[in-house]
Amino acid sequence: MDRPPSLPHYQNPNPNLFYHYPPPNSNPNFFFRPPPPPLQNPNNYSIVPSPPPIRELSGTLSSLKSLLSECQRTLDSLSQNLALDHSSLLQKDENGCFVRCPFDSNHFMPPEALFLHSLRCPNTLDLIHLLESFSSYRNTLELPCELQLNNGDGDLCISLDDLADFGSNFFYRDCPGAVKFSELDGKKRTLTLPHVLSVECSDFVGSDEKVKKIVLDKCLGVLPSDLCAMKNEIDQWRDFPSSYSSSVLSSIVGSKVVEISALRKWILVNSTRYGVIIDTFMRDHIFLLFRLCLKSAVKEACGFRMESDATDVGEQKIMSCKSSTFECPVFIQVLSWLASQLAVLYGEGNGKFFALDMFKQCIVESASQVMLFRLEGTRSKCSGVVEDLDDARLRNKDVIMEKPFENSSGGECGKTLDSPQVISVSRVSAAVAALYERSLLEEKIRAVRYAQPLTRYQRAAELGFMTAKADEERNRRCSYRPIIDHDGRPRQRSLNQDMDKMKTREELLAEERDYKRRRMSYRGKKVKRTPRQVLHDMIEEYTEEIKLAGGIGCFEKGMPLQSRSPIGNDQKESDFGYSIPSTDKQWKGENRADIEYPIDNRQNSDKVKRHDEYDSGSSQRQQSHRSYKHSDRRDDKLRDRRKDKHNDRRDDEFTRTKRHSIEGESYQNYRSSREKSSSDYKTKRDDPYDRRSQQPRNQNLFEDRYIPTEKE
């Protein structure tokens, strides 16, 4: 029996489902092509992927910009990991540097000029005028010091109201109304100075500087390995530390060799990171507070060092110092106090981190100064205080500089924290008051710089809040008067004396009924008034009250007001020149009837007069029988009638003037026609009222449209 032939391993019984490529070509010929794949089912064609789109020039530029931004971000993170100060990246020379404007990255300037530049950047914004109202903190840096006795263990409480101009919460300077909030103006700003800080001031006697000098003479240096460990330790501080290591202790004890100019420049440059751009005066105030807190921290660290020296001896002393940690309650207290003072200007969060970072910077600077085996290039060129650090002995003797020169920042290079400086209670109080004053200036600057239009909901919410606050303020003041009643212009009260009396239920119901009727009548009359007209009427009403009270344009109270319309109620329209002068001269010598209003207008005026008589009589009857009605209702009706009467008169006068101009042209023709027919003319003069007779009369075309009138 024959064996069935076997299929090759690369063949597939169903080529439409699976396809295996043939085995590698055994032919070494380079130009050999493998056989094409078998045909597939037309329903199973695969879609060939489209080629990638060609990028345009704009897309390429955007990709390059994103790449550059990523590179810049990487460099920034690298510089932060290396603990590089961003202010040292833009070195101007050995004594100064340039900083970048936070509002325009193309502007570079010295740190001392950044504050004034920020008030003019951009060019459309100019806030220099705000410095005129807040400038007292610039003059309180050198206050006199008064020597006092030790205050004991209690804290000092000092008032700050006399040390700075905090302004007043006035919307209007000359009005004692509810536009001024008493809880804000009545708030007294005080400073509480803890005992651990007050004893470090120069005002008090009993300072223990001799003890600290003894400890500083025995201070140990910091090894390079300890410096790295100390940096890692303080980088982990996210809150006020409850304890620190011996390396931090040594850095705090040796912090008096840190240069003042370096710390001042750091405060001035890095204040922008915490949201506020400060000037050199504010920098000096902040540095004074920091230096006071540092003195208490150094005093506590010296106490820890003296305790370790008394308990341990020799090698055990060194090993115990390297491995032990020290609880620091005073360090926490002074940090909290400094953060609370900086929170006035920077806010609670930024003030806390700013105070903590200042101490971190000081500790790092001190450790780099007291570090053993330093290179010559890392030593300060203008220090002159620490001469020999390799032998772990810090010489705290008075070192006389030849001539301390001033750098570009205005500070004296060579002065360290060990240099004598008067830190009095008055200067500390002035520094805290400067923070309050500077915060008010910062609020005004931000209100102008970051001004944004409020939404309708925000405006309504702010209006409701201010209204509720004003109501609360009015309830606290029994002698509150509206603004219009101030300045000697009391408003005219209602003439109805019944308003001050207790009213019965019937009177109240009658008033409510009258109010509804008046509202319905106003709704029908004033429906065509625009909001502008309503506001105009309100302003006129208040203006009348002010004039009656002796206000604008009146030298005495109660002077009669001039009518708002050019025509008085008891004056004729001819007195104001509404008639044509030339026509009057021509008709003055003729014996004829003067021109009057047209018949329909005259009838309307008669109706108005009859209505006036009826209303006056009815108002008298109502006043005699119903005394509970308000007089303002009659005043409103009379005012409306006067306005309507005035408008009708103006319209009639305009029609009359226009008619006179037409009749004046044909008057000469009329005279010639009268001379030709003298008999008819005499008849017209003898019977001037024949126009009202019921008998028909033949008149010419001119007489049909000419109506003689009586003399006014």
Swiss-Prot record:
Major localization listed first in the record, in broad terms: nucleus
Question: Which BP terms from GO are recorded?
Answer: mRNA processing; RNA splicing
List cellular component terms (GO): spliceosomal complex
> What's the domain of life for this entry?
Eukaryota
Q: Where are the zinc fingers (CHHC U11-48K-type)?
A: 98-125
Q: Which UniProt keywords apply?
A: Metal-binding, mRNA processing, mRNA splicing, Nucleus, Ribonucleoprotein, Spliceosome, Zinc, Zinc-finger
Keyword Zinc appears in the UniProt entry: yes
Q: Where in the cell is it found?
A: Nucleus
The subunit structure is:
Component of the U11/U12 snRNPs that are part of the U12-type spliceosome. Not found in the major spliceosome.
Q: What functional role does this protein have? A: Likely involved in U12-type 5' splice site recognition.
What protein name is recorded for this chain? U11/U12 small nuclear ribonucleoprotein 48 kDa protein
Q: Which organism is it from?
A: Arabidopsis thaliana (Mouse-ear cress)
